[in-house]
Amino acid sequence: MGKKKIVTKKEGEADAGPKARSSARSGKKHVSAGTLYVQSTYNNTKLLLTDKDGNALAWSSSGAIGFKGAKKGTPFAAAKVGELIGEKAQNIGIKEVDVVVRGVGSGRESGIRAFISKGIELTTIKDRTPIPHNGPKPRKPRTV
């Protein structure tokens, strides 16, 4: 076994959780309304915040904040992503958002709930999950 490194925290230092991301860019632009795109798959949850023209203001995903493997697809990870994007939206000055949801993952609802818990008003929710019109053959069901 090798040596163990012991890290001592000083006063005033706060634990930022898994991989705290700096949002240095997010303070520059001030927008009052925007659109939140939620892409939720079985393996990951991604949130993208744009202005009304579609220009990206902030984004994050479960993998980007430090979750690995199967934990990325959990509702808890999606809630953490929603909180992070909600804080970035507050810094930008967003007051109301439209939500567009894509995918069938378990983080759909919890990501949105965590986002609106930051005090941002939700105007509409649209479900734009892609549905094939008899495209390629789907995956076989998983056997457990």
Predicted regions and their residues:
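Ribosome-associated RNA-binding proteins
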Residues: M1-V144
